[in-house]
């Protein structure tokens, strides 16, 4: 009896207020999705990327334009005088080449004028180093060696250790072994959400999901209370 009455209410609302029913169903689905996603974030500590990337790092990478990284000779030495080294993780992928089984080092030197810098900074050099290791880790660490005034002031989204960064001479190998990368396509920054951010996000999604489901329940209860009662068979016969 209750299921028939609920079906009658739903049929009546669909016939007379279809936009209201569709909006309620959409809110109900959003609430259920919020509960599911919030519970997943609180129970599973997965690595999720954050869209909040420091803009000075985005502008710094875009200023390189097309970057050509070439293999280097020998071991990488220490950094130059007055230089500062910053390493960060990017989505740059060098693929599976013939030398993929050994650690490779690629470098490029970029002058400040090419990056759009003016004045005395235009003559400064920025050394970009990429170390491709044999470990199957996502992304590649890039190291930037330059004076502190040129490098971004904020912390890298995902920093890398300074191991493997510094100065070296470009190898006189064939130019085909160099890797050309457009900075606005290949050097995409990655930043993972911390455990505190995951907890905050999951709890807010749970609260939002509960609120939406409660709101949908109140809407259904209001519609059931103000719905005109169906006349019984005996009352129609009496009339």
Swiss-Prot record:
<keyword id="KW-0732">Signal</keyword>
<dbReference type="GO" id="GO:0005886">
    <property type="term" value="C:plasma membrane"/>
</dbReference>
<dbReference type="InterPro" id="IPR039587">
    <property type="entry name" value="TMEM248/TMEM219_dom"/>
</dbReference>
<dbReference type="Pfam" id="PF14940">
    <property type="entry name" value="TMEM219"/>
</dbReference>
<keyword id="KW-0472">Membrane</keyword>
<feature type="topological domain" description="Cytoplasmic">
    <location>
        <begin position="227"/>
        <end position="239"/>
    </location>
</feature>
<dbReference type="GO" id="GO:0006915">
    <property type="term" value="P:apoptotic process"/>
</dbReference>
<feature type="glycosylation site" description="N-linked (GlcNAc...) asparagine">
    <location>
        <position position="101"/>
    </location>
</feature>
<feature type="transmembrane region" description="Helical">
    <location>
        <begin position="206"/>
        <end position="226"/>
    </location>
</feature>
<keyword id="KW-1003">Cell membrane</keyword>
<keyword id="KW-0325">Glycoprotein</keyword>
<keyword id="KW-0053">Apoptosis</keyword>
<keyword id="KW-0812">Transmembrane</keyword>
<keyword id="KW-0675">Receptor</keyword>
<feature type="topological domain" description="Extracellular">
    <location>
        <begin position="39"/>
        <end position="205"/>
    </location>
</feature>
<comment type="subunit">
    <text>Interacts with IGFBP3. Interacts with CASP8.</text>
</comment>
<feature type="signal peptide">
    <location>
        <begin position="1"/>
        <end position="38"/>
    </location>
</feature>
<comment type="function">
    <text>Cell death receptor specific for IGFBP3, may mediate caspase-8-dependent apoptosis upon ligand binding.</text>
</comment>
<keyword id="KW-1133">Transmembrane helix</keyword>
<feature type="glycosylation site" description="N-linked (GlcNAc...) asparagine">
    <location>
        <position position="167"/>
    </location>
</feature>
<dbReference type="InterPro" id="IPR039493">
    <property type="entry name" value="TMEM248/TMEM219"/>
</dbReference>
<protein>
    <recommendedName>
        <fullName>Insulin-like growth factor-binding protein 3 receptor</fullName>
    </recommendedName>
</protein>
């Amino acid at each position: 009896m209750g299921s028939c009455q609920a079906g009658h209410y739903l049929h009546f609302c669909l016939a007379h207020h279809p936009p209201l029913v569709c909006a309620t169903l959409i809110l109900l689905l959003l609430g259920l999705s919020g509960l599911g996603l919030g519970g997943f974030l609180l129970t599973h500590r997965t690595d999720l990327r954050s869209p909040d990337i420091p803009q000075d790092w985005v502008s710094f990478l875009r200023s390189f334009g097309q970057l050509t990284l070439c293999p280097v000779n020998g071991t990488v030495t220490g950094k130059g005088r007055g230089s500062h080294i910053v390493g960060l993780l990017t989505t740059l992928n060098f693929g599976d080449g013939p030398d993929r089984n050994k650690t490779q080092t690629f470098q490029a030197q970029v002058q400040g004028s090419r990056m759009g810098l003016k004045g005395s900074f235009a003559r400064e050099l920025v050394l970009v180093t990429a170390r491709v290791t044999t470990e199957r880790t996502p992304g590649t660490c890039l190291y930037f060696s330059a004076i502190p005034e040129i490098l971004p002031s904020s912390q890298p989204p995902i920093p890398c250790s300074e191991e493997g960064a510094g100065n070296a001479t470009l190898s006189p190998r064939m130019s085909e072994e160099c890797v050309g990368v457009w900075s606005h396509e290949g050097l995409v920054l990655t930043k993972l959400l911390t455990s505190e951010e995951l907890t905050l996000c999951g709890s807010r999604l749970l609260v939002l999901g509960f609120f939406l489901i409660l709101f949908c329940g109140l809407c259904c209860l209001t519609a059931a209370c103000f719905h005109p009662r169906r006349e019984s068979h005996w009352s129609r016969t009496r009339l």
